[in-house]
Amino acid sequence: MKQLYGVIGNPIGHSLSPVMHNDAFEHLNMDAHYHAFLVEEELLGEAVRGLKALGISGFNVTTPHKVAIMEYLDEIDPLARKIGAVNTVVHKDGRLIGYNTDGIGFVRALQSISNEPLQGKRILLLGSGGASRAIYFSLADVGVKEIDVANRTVDKAKELIAARTADVNSVALSLEKATEEQGNYDIIIQTTTIGMHPHVEHTPLQICSLKKGTIVSDIIYNPFETKILCEAKEQGAIIQNGIDMFVYQGALAFEMWTGRTPNIERMKQLVIEKLGG
């Protein structure tokens, strides 16, 4: 019988996940289909019960359901609970188990462009929202020891740092202070929506004094190169946009559901093509 997978969210019509996963199923000769389901917030509980009753094998969760879905699941992975959000659900032995592949997906994406282990790196995170939280805890989970957090509201950065459980040295900074200190970091990660289309002229941090070999990663992929990435490239940095994170988190979910490893490069090229790159 054909296996059913999907993604729930609102809006959902723009999602690239069905194209990416269905191509992977076809490429691996798997009898499976991935579908996008529009789910209103007030109907989330009913939708989850319905998907479970239909025997869905697994599904992704996107805006605005990543936090609210947690109360409807049978089990939540410890890292997802720490992050406070779920983006991947596995249906196993009649139980719905929630995971968060956003942060781990980002870490894998970052490792793919880093010539050295991340563990010894000094990292600056820009922003303290849901994406930043997922990345912060996932970096800590793989043993990164120095992660500073810069935010427009410093208290929000302090809140994120205060929630840590791993042995991580972290300082909360203003964006102004981060601008001054940018040369002290090996990796800078931009996790906010600042610079996203159509506000492409905006940036949370002016890049002006990076040290040689710095990696600057932005989780935005529209545009492909945000202002912060353009400035970093001019400074000679290694840059990475959000396509890698999107692909790696999707590939990780695929592995969790199926036990199979999809072709990452094929996934990435398909997403770039669909985005008009």
Curated annotation (Swiss-Prot):
Keywords: Amino-acid biosynthesis, Aromatic amino acid biosynthesis, NADP, Oxidoreductase. Gene3D superfamilies: Leucine Dehydrogenase, chain A, domain 1, NAD(P)-binding Rossmann-like Domain. Disulfide bonds: none annotated. Shikimate binds at S15, L16, S17, T62, N87, D102, Y221. The keyword Phosphoprotein does not apply. Pfam families: SDH_C, Shikimate_DH, Shikimate_dh_N. Pathway: Metabolic intermediate biosynthesis; chorismate biosynthesis; chorismate from D-erythrose 4-phosphate and phosphoenolpyruvate: step 4/7. It comes from the Bacteria. Its EC number is 1.1.1.25. Belongs to the shikimate dehydrogenase family. This is Shikimate dehydrogenase (NADP(+)). The lineage of its organism: Bacteria, Bacillati, Bacillota, Bacilli, Bacillales. The gene is aroE.
